[in-house]
Amino acid sequence: MTKTIGLLVMAYGTPYKESDIEPYYTDIRRGKKPTEEELQDLKDRYEFIGGLSPLAGTTDRQAEALLEALNKEQDDVNFKLYIGLKHISPYIEEAVEQMHNDGIKEAVTVVLAPHYSSFSVGSYDQRAQEKADEYGIQLTHIKHYYQQPKFIKYWTEKINETLEQIPNQEHDETVLVVSAHSLPKGLIERNNDPYPHELHETAEILKQESNIIHVAEGWQSEGNTGTPWLGPDVQDLTRDLYKEHQFKHFIYTPVGFVCEHLEVLYDNDYECKVVCDDIGVNYYRPEMPNTHPLFIGAIVDEIQSHI
């Protein structure tokens, strides 16, 4: 008899329409409403990338692709999909409640973020767990999947494809900037959080597996909290790398993200490119994983190792 297990795919969430922007931003700021200036700044960023972020649709497609791939691999288990978002409906708690209403007793949770931090993935897991405990649902949490061979293979292929656009004799004048979303430094240090190490390990593996010669690690998209965040910021890093090594070609791989959204389309494709244009170097940013079979396969492999 086939057993039904819940598959709770969790993600950050993004506004679906312009009127969602203020409540969404307020939720991110833990109930503190943004000023008119802050709200307009966010609206301007969305406008710059062509309206609202494509994240919502991509999250749905990634979750559906993951469900399909998992169910193809299983004969005795049937996964049922639930999507839970951090900052907009359907919230994580709503997804767990729906599981309960559907009679789900057991579920696997996965966050659409490849590296673990107690501040990010850990907070998603905690919210899901607290709600699941109310209903007696047993959850298996997938912590990370950056180390999965298919995840590494995806990025290795993209790096090598990008290098092919650069003359061979200029590969030594090319640098790969590997980045993830910055987080508050104090919080990371207090918790002895593995997040910076996991990004470093990713960068090291990509250097070993790809044809790139020079690799640098950076952080991006930090919040405006008035406290130190993990650095160096990718824009500062770009200027420093150029100043120290005179690299001609900069390849940006924001491996902490899994699709094209505001942080990639604006913070990389606009802000980093502005810096590259300013110092007179070439900007490259390979396509993000989105629903690529290697990326989906990496998550499938990680889930299968836990069930």
Curated annotation (Swiss-Prot):
<comment type="function">
    <text>Involved in coproporphyrin-dependent heme b biosynthesis. Catalyzes the insertion of ferrous iron into coproporphyrin III to form Fe-coproporphyrin III.</text>
</comment>
<feature type="binding site">
    <location>
        <position position="53"/>
    </location>
    <ligand>
        <name>Fe-coproporphyrin III</name>
    </ligand>
</feature>
<keyword id="KW-0963">Cytoplasm</keyword>
<dbReference type="InterPro" id="IPR019772">
    <property type="entry name" value="Ferrochelatase_AS"/>
</dbReference>
<comment type="similarity">
    <text>Belongs to the ferrochelatase family.</text>
</comment>
<feature type="binding site" description="axial binding residue">
    <location>
        <position position="12"/>
    </location>
    <ligand>
        <name>Fe-coproporphyrin III</name>
    </ligand>
</feature>
<comment type="pathway">
    <text>Porphyrin-containing compound metabolism; protoheme biosynthesis.</text>
</comment>
<keyword id="KW-0350">Heme biosynthesis</keyword>
<feature type="binding site">
    <location>
        <position position="124"/>
    </location>
    <ligand>
        <name>Fe-coproporphyrin III</name>
    </ligand>
</feature>
<dbReference type="InterPro" id="IPR001015">
    <property type="entry name" value="Ferrochelatase"/>
</dbReference>
<dbReference type="Pfam" id="PF00762">
    <property type="entry name" value="Ferrochelatase"/>
</dbReference>
<dbReference type="InterPro" id="IPR033659">
    <property type="entry name" value="Ferrochelatase_N"/>
</dbReference>
<dbReference type="GO" id="GO:0004325">
    <property type="term" value="F:ferrochelatase activity"/>
</dbReference>
<dbReference type="InterPro" id="IPR033644">
    <property type="entry name" value="Ferrochelatase_C"/>
</dbReference>
<dbReference type="GO" id="GO:0006783">
    <property type="term" value="P:heme biosynthetic process"/>
</dbReference>
<keyword id="KW-0479">Metal-binding</keyword>
<feature type="binding site">
    <location>
        <position position="181"/>
    </location>
    <ligand>
        <name>Fe(2+)</name>
    </ligand>
</feature>
<feature type="binding site">
    <location>
        <begin position="45"/>
        <end position="46"/>
    </location>
    <ligand>
        <name>Fe-coproporphyrin III</name>
    </ligand>
</feature>
<keyword id="KW-0456">Lyase</keyword>
<keyword id="KW-0627">Porphyrin biosynthesis</keyword>
<protein>
    <recommendedName>
        <fullName>Coproporphyrin III ferrochelatase</fullName>
        <ecNumber>4.99.1.9</ecNumber>
    </recommendedName>
</protein>
<dbReference type="GO" id="GO:0046872">
    <property type="term" value="F:metal ion binding"/>
</dbReference>
<feature type="binding site">
    <location>
        <position position="29"/>
    </location>
    <ligand>
        <name>Fe-coproporphyrin III</name>
    </ligand>
</feature>
<dbReference type="GO" id="GO:0005737">
    <property type="term" value="C:cytoplasm"/>
</dbReference>
<keyword id="KW-0408">Iron</keyword>
<feature type="binding site">
    <location>
        <position position="263"/>
    </location>
    <ligand>
        <name>Fe(2+)</name>
    </ligand>
</feature>
